[in-house]
Amino acid sequence: MIPPPAGGSGSAPTGTVFDSTGQFVVSANGLSGGAIFLFATEDGTISGSPAVDLNNAILAVDNSASGAVYKGLASAQIGSANFLYATNFHDNTIEMYDSGFNLVNTFSDPNVPPRYAPFGIRVIDGKLYVTFAEQNKEKHDDKAGPNHGFVDVFDLDGSNRRRLVSRHGLNSPWGLALAPANFGKFSNALLVGNFGNGHISAYDPNSGAFLGQLQDQNGQVLTIDGLWTITFGNGVSTGPANTLFFTAGIDDESHGLFGRLDAIQ
């Protein structure tokens, strides 16, 4: 169970991180331990589930009072230190926390158009990839539409921002994954999952050039309602390294879907 913010009655989790370092220690009710899973929520909280009680996450960050809306979460190591990165969609910023859950940095892209804010986030090959989506009036949810989106790349400390993709093939982009060398037509491509229309677009990971979109066996562009996470297996416990797994909130996020995509050419 993921706890609600102070005074709340429920939580809406978004980003999830698995952490094997044990450095993100959470404590409550006499229990303490390194979080195995960490969760960000649209309620403005970050929680962790320690090994001693995996079924009950413990609140570590609560920024609900300031209106924070976390849409994504990632983790990375700089030297011997571990950090969390949360995309605060409401406040148009990426928040960087150390292993003690102290806020150590905030950053964003000042050059995106007004009302665009960090949405999805993932560490790929030692770089921080961040998607940007358009905010709705309340700055709580995205405003979907063709070409509504950007993808940036940052160093792990938030510096050296570089725009990789602008608009083309994007529609409230959230999921990110780098394809392996044996994923058919889109081998070695950066894949971006669009929450807005359920399409998965492929780009050159260096130049950002648009390469196309994933299609089904009949040549039709794949559409996955409510598409969220996309990730490849690790070749061992989480499945084949060239199988793309996905999660989705189908039927306007009232149900969940977990599936897989395999390249046939």
Q: Language-model segments: which ranges?
A:
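Sequence/structural signature of beta-propeller domains
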Residues: 1-265
